[in-house]
Structure formats: C-alpha cells, structure tokens
Amino acid sequence: MRAEDPYRRIAAVYDRLIEPMQAEVRSVALDVVPPHPGWQVLDVGCGTGTGMARYVEAGCTVTGVDVSESMLERARARLGDRAALHLTDGDTLPFDGGRFDLVTTSMVLHEVAADARMALVAEMVRVARPDSRLLFIDFRFGSLRGWKGPMLRALSEVVERFSGHYSGYRSFKTSDGVPGVVGKAGLGIEREKIVAGGNVAIYVVAPKP
C-alpha cells in the first residue's frame, strides 16, 4: 500500500509559494544543458510540471515521475497529453534501460533518506543512454556569495526543519550534497553551475564513469 501523499496539503499552493524561487534556476539549467528537439527527457520528482513544460516547449518528448498524486494532478492540468506522467518512487523507475537522452531531478535528493538517494541515482543511470547526461539541481553547502547566499541558506535551514524530511536534508548535507552522492555512485561531475548566491548548484554528470 502506498503511503499517504506527502504533498497533498501543499500541492494547491506550490506554484505560488515555491516555484517562483526556482524559476530562475530552471532557466539557467536550460542554458547549462540546452535541450535538443526530439530528445527523450525524464524528470524524476517532476512535481507540478513547470520544469517539464520548458522541455516540451523545446520539442522534447517528456516523461515525468513523482511520488505525489496531488502534484501529478497539477502537472496533468498544465501539460495535458504533452507529457507522460507516472506515480512511482524514484528508486523503482518503470522504464527500460538506456532509454533517455537527459535525466534530470530538481530539489529531490535532499528530501530522501540516504539509501533511497543512492537507489534513485542508480535508477537514473540505468535508464539513461550511455551518451546522455544526468542533470542534478539541489542545495550546495560550500561558500556563499553576496547578500542572497546567506539569506537563502538561513531560509532553507528553517524550511527544511519544518518540512517533514529534515533527516534527509541533514544526511544530504553531511554527505557533501550532490558531489558526495555522485562520487559514492562512482560517477564524476562534468560541470557545476553555482546559482542562488551559492546556496544551490546545477550539476552535469555523465551516466558512465
């Protein structure tokens, strides 16, 4: 039996409260890995579909997965039949291996437990084509920049403490974030783009070491 929808209460207001803080990062991500028309793109933890919409507009064939039916309902309302949506955990992706040209996940790794985090990355690697790329967007725990960095770091700490998944955030932080996770998976980071005053980074990773 699937657990209670963890985002049932926030789904209705997510795009108004949370998405504005992520919009700039999503735009930068498109510059970091420009999508090609015809690409098969998978968004793991697709939420309300705002990230997928950008790839649809670029002419990609887009698939999204999420653990929240409430969030997927919002994604369906936004995208209709322009994206294939699946209710599933990231550590059990229902796709054949080597299918996708780009596999992306945004602000997901810090929310899950360490074992689920590694399983999710392994599944992303499995479903990616050998010549594809993995794109990770998540918190960064290095030095901060300007006034925005410290402000967002403090805000993030408060939000995560009351979000219901602080243990995941804490273990993600002590594991050195995305660099630690992909390093443990035997992968290497090809490019890091620091955004949000150093509080978030976009990482490009090859699916094969």
Residue ranges and their predicted role:
Residues 1-36, 50, 152:
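Conserved class I S-adenosyl-L-methionine
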Residues 42, 48-92:
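Class I SAM-dependent methyltransferase SAM/SAH-binding core
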Residues 104:
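A conserved beta-strand element that flanks and buttresses the S-adenosyl-L-methionine
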Residues 107-108:
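Short catalytic micro-motifs in class I SAM-dependent methyltransferases
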Residues 118-130:
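A short glycine-rich, Lys/Arg-flanked "PGG" loop and its adjoining helix->strand segment in the class I
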Residues 137-185, 191-193:
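C-terminal alpha-helical "lid/dimerization" subdomain adjacent to the S-adenosyl-L-methionine
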Residues 185-187, 191-209:
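Core SAM-dependent methyltransferase catalytic element
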